């Protein structure tokens, strides 16, 4: 009987997802679903102004093409259980978005290992996966395909996506004419059409009206109750406290603190509220 049930679930997954990487995880609630060990991300920062291919190749051949190494994340260790809600705090450039891109399989670490199980719906950048030249209707199918959904599944969820996004009157309008809030509605509605094992939201809900933000927060809460794992980045500390039970504070690619959301948020807020150190004034020349 158990084998029959497993076979049925596998068939259901095949109707929804076109990629094996997007099939539902077998990880039980409370077990590790995301594991990062000693993850380091390096970027090459080019300070030279090279504006054509000829100059680029000349510098490359003559070994005059110099890069400065930039460490975006350094030796990050993270163990996230299925069903947990994690908030990531830090100032701009701390490495929060980079960390989420690692989990989303967008970036490959220079060193360390990353293990992610199950389906991932990533809302990392406003407009990512959305073609501004296409209509909202066409983008629902395009974005859904990029997330690994089958055409049959997108068609079955089409009305639900449109209803949640509240874009009924703009379905056949080019997305390039949409406001930032309308793009957010569209992207969030598509990403949450099926409850993923892991939902990643990176400051995408910073735009949009208050009513839709509350609607999205309620949707995320419902998904958490059903076992979805949440990775959430926001500069709104109150929102992180409300939505998450765990938090990580990053600063220039390094981990400052990891723990329960209230403790980490309070420590981060205290640091941000502290007066800036006074600038040392140079002594007057005699």
Residue ranges of each PLM-predicted region?
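Conserved ABC ATPase "signature" region
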Residues: 54-61, 141, 153-170
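Helical segment within the ABC ATPase nucleotide-binding domain
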Residues: 213-226
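H-loop (His-switch) and adjacent beta-strand-loop-beta switch element
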Residues: 243-260, 268
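H-loop/switch region of ABC-family ATPase nucleotide-binding domains
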Residues: 234-235
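Pre-NBD coupling/linker segments of ABC/ABC-like ATPases
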Residues: 2-72, 261-283
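The feature captures the beta-strand-to-loop junction immediately N-terminal to the Walker
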Residues: 89-91
């Amino acid at each position: 009987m158990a084998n029959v049930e497993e076979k049925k679930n596998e068939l259901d997954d095949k109707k929804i997802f076109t990629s094996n990487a997007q099939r539902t995880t077998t990880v039980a609630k409370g077990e590790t679903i995301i594991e990062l060990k000693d993850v380091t991300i390096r970027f090459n920062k080019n300070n030279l102004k090279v504006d054509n291919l000829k100059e680029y190749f000349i510098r490359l051949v003559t070994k005059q093409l110099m890069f400065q190494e930039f460490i975006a994340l350094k030796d990050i260790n993270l163990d996230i259980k299925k069903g947990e809600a994690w908030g990531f705090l830090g100032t701009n450039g701390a490495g929060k978005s980079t960390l989420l891109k690692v989990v989303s399989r967008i970036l490959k670490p220079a060193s360390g290992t990353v293990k992610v199980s199950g389906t991932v719906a990533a809302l990392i950048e406003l407009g990512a996966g959305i073609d501004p030249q296409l209509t909202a209707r066409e983008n629902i199918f395009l974005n859904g395909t990029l997330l690994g959904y089958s055409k049959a599944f997108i068609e079955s969820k089409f009305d639900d996506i449109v209803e949640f996004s509240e874009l009924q009157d703009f379905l056949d309008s080019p997305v390039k004419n949409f406001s930032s809030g309308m793009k957010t509605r569209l992207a969030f509605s598509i990403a949450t059409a099926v409850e993923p094992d892991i939902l990643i939201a990176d400051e995408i809900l910073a735009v949009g009206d208050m009513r839709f933000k509350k609607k999205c927060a309620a949707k995320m809460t419902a998904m958490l109750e059903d076992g979805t794992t949440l990775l959430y980045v926001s500069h709104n500390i109150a929102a992180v406290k409300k939505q998450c039970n765990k938090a990580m504070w990053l600063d220039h690619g390094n981990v400052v603190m990891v723990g329960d959301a209230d403790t980490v948020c309070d420590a981060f807020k205290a640091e941000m509220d502290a007066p800036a150190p006074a600038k040392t004034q140079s002594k007057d020349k005699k």
